[in-house]
Amino acid sequence: MSSQRNYCLAGCLSSCILVILMSFSDAASFQYYQVPQQDQEYRMKTLQRLPSPDMLKALEYIENLRKQASRTESLPDYTSYQGAPFLSEQKDTQALSTDTAKSPTSDDESEWMRAMLEALMQAEKEAKVSPQEKNNLYMDKNIPPELIEDYDSNKWSEKRPKAGKFSSRLYDDYSRDNPLKRTNEIVEGQYTPQSLATLQSVFQELGKLKGQANNKRDRMEEDQKLYKDDEDDLYKANNIAYEDVAGGEDWNPIEEKVESQTQEELKESKEEVEKTDDMEDEIKRSGLLGLQDEEPEKDTKEQESENLSNLMNTYLNMWMNRMDKGKQNPDRRSLRFSGKELDPEAIYQLIDISRNLQIPPEDLIDMLRDEDGRKFGGRLESEKEVDVPLDLDEVTETMTDKTNVYKNKQGFVRQPTSPVLPNIPEGLTVEDMVNLMGADKLQNRFKQNNGLQRPYPMLSKIKGHKAIWPKESEKRQIEYESRPEKEEELADYVVKMLAKYPELLGNNQNKKMPIPYSAGDLQELEKQYENALRGYVNMRGYQDLETVSSSNRRLSTRENDDTQNKQYIDEDLLMKVLEYLNQEKAEKARDHSVKRSMENM
């Protein structure tokens, strides 16, 4: 009973396995022969669907069972698929099948198994692809076909190793001796998809490098082709001309000359191309250097401008300090010129010079007074040399705004109330001018001829309307006249004084304060000034005298007895001349200071 049960179980197992294997074999054969076209992806899939070694081991195990059941049947040779592992499995399975019994149906089943294995062997052989087809399959993936070849196609000796000769210890040595066993597994272990991808990327980069190196070669080849085409055209034309003249003789020496010429032209063209490349590289480098050099030039220019501004500020500060020193000693003024006699012609020359040189008369008087004061041990100190500071960045900056020029009601240009250099000695008035010109000496000269006296004081300003500017007489005075030699000498002297003392150009007229005098002093000064003006009017003519007297009469009617102040017409004239001539005083002072600073540098 036990033998029958074992036989039934073995039959059921074999039938199930046969059904499964037949389904696999039919599907493989149908899919392989169904596709007529050669599709690479499909072939790769079919190669992967071949029977695996595990399947073959299972089939061999079944055959071993059949052999134990019916020992008359011989086993097929499966060593090409699995090799030595079958030996150890055979020893294990022999003990299990000793009690199995024989039956008449076992022959049919063994035949079915043998036929099935033969069909599988044929399918494997047909599935093997030729080497040329393998090359076409793996060209796109940059995989060498040698790595994909199936080494099982090589036929080895069919001598099967005997079980008794080899022990389990020698199995590893035996597997190592045969280099073509399980080669597919070894190759798959060595070349993974990641390693293949890295190899592919390396080959692509090498191709790019080669492409960059070959660009120049391609250009040279194109140039050579163009030259060859030109040579062919020349050969044709020369051959035709030579055949017409010489009757078709050989053209070899001329061809050699043409070839030599073309070779020389090619060499020259190569040299020109190399030269142009070198020139482009030099131009690029020079452009970069030029951009780098422009920045330090700009920095140097900015530094120079800052240095000049700092120098100008230092000079202005020093001049202002000198003005402060002169302002601290206003009491030193004295009537040093009272001992000298001054003709009325000097007054006219002074006004004319101030008009022609556009310098206020007060500045001229100050310069003359300072020069004489220096001769007699005057108050001006010796001019010190200007020390330029070493570090120009430490110099304090001063604001030097432009002067705002505007016109008064009568149309004359007037300077603003805040001049460029405000620190100037104050208190210089018309009485100082009269005293400096020596009007007290002129009084004795004109008392004999003209004994007229002014009944009103002269040093106060007019409260009412000022005298109208005389049109014809002043137009004649404003006209430019040729200066005599004395006047030119005086002008040169004034220019020299201005060069030495530029601070005298900026007298502040709007901050003048009258110095208090006694009544007797005022009357004496009034008489002196009146006599000086009479002499001046006599020099200019009787017509001018009439205009001055009429204007003085109009002024006298508008004044009160003792409280109201009077002023001569010439004082108003001098003030207007000063207003007219001081319009460019600040600009000239600046220009002169800049010139001196540049000379000292």
Curated annotation (Swiss-Prot):
Compartments where found: Secreted
Keyword Hydrolase attributed: no
Alphabetical list of InterPro entries matching this protein: Granin, ScgII
Listed GO biological process terms: angiogenesis; eosinophil chemotaxis
Principal subcellular localization: secreted
Biased composition (Polar residues): 93-104
Composition bias type Basic and acidic residues, residue spans: 258-273
GO cellular component, one term: extracellular space
In-chain residues carrying the UniProt-annotated modification Sulfotyrosine: Y151
Span list, region Disordered: 89-109, 258-307
Keyword Ubl conjugation in annotation: no
Single GO molecular function: cytokine activity
Record keywords: Cleavage on pair of basic residues, Secreted, Signal, Sulfation
Signal peptide: 1-30
Family (UniProt): Belongs to the chromogranin/secretogranin protein family.
The protein's role, per its UniProt record: Neuroendocrine protein of the granin family that regulates the biogenesis of secretory granules.
Descriptive protein name: Secretogranin-2
